């Protein structure tokens, strides 16, 4: 199943098959793809929260790059641990995106 996930780019997509989700640059382990405007950040927020986080928690996430603490994760792990996913609303999500460099320094994230 192809899932259109605009945000990082307008044509971003993820591939969901069986118990696997290939996320490209949309979702990484503990991180997400970058955006360059509020509008794109909102699209990304909707893609992540309404589309990807609605998948079963045991779904294995295979990002396009290994930028996290592990090369793979699960939807459940991302719901519990990804700082972007656990934000309570879009404004908090956007604040984190705009202050990601400082957040990484404060939390020892590379």
Q: Where are these predicted regions, by residue range?
A:
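Accessory terminal helices/loops
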Residues: 43-110
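Catalytic core of the metallo-beta-lactamase
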Residues: 1-58, 62-63, 92
């Amino acid at each position: 199943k192809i899932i259109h996930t605009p945000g990082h780019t307008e044509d971003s997509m993820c591939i969901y098959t069986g118990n696997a989700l290939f996320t490209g640059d949309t979702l990484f382990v503990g991180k997400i793809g970058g955006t360059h405007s509020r509008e794109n950040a909102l699209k990304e927020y909707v893609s992540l929260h309404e589309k990807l986080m609605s998948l079963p928690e045991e779904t294995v996430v295979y990002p396009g790059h290994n930028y996290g603490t592990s090369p793979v994760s699960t939807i459940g792990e991302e719901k519990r641990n990804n700082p972007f996913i656990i934000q309570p609303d879009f404004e908090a999500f956007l604040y984190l995106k705009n202050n990601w460099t400082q957040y990484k320094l404060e939390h020892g994230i590379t």
